[in-house]
């Protein structure tokens, strides 16, 4: 699976800022399906932890609000060490600046506010 195809699907989503994280997951799932991208939702790969979306080695991690940078980096550090993870796309409501690579894996930030044009 090419990251570009996933990013194209994500760029088609326009959501209200009143949606909760579960509703955002539904919108992402709908966009991925429309673009014929097969995914696993709430994919359990770590004990007591699930990836929001798993797409052939690419993890989509969804955050409704702006997370703590340290907390996010710690989470991404754990995720990038999981065998089979090739890249992580972090879908955020607000942008956070983090490295573009971690443990040799690509990290991409997709900001709802900047890239999706949240509707009110």
Region roles according to the model:
Residues 117-120:
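C-terminal interaction segment
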């Amino acid at each position: 699976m090419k990251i570009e195809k996933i990013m194209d699907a994500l760029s088609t989503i326009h959501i209200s800022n009143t949606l909760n994280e579960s509703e955002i997951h539904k919108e992402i799932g709908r966009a991925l399906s429309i673009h014929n991208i097969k995914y696993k939702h709430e994919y359990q790969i770590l004990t007591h932890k699930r990836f929001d979306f798993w797409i052939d080695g690419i993890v989509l991690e969804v955050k409704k609000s702006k997370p703590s940078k340290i907390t996010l980096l710690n989470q991404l550090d754990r995720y990038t060490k999981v065998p089979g993870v090739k890249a992580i796309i972090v879908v955020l409501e607000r942008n956070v600046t983090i490295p573009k690579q971690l443990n040799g894996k690509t990290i991409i930030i997709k900001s709802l506010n900047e890239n999706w044009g949240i509707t009110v």
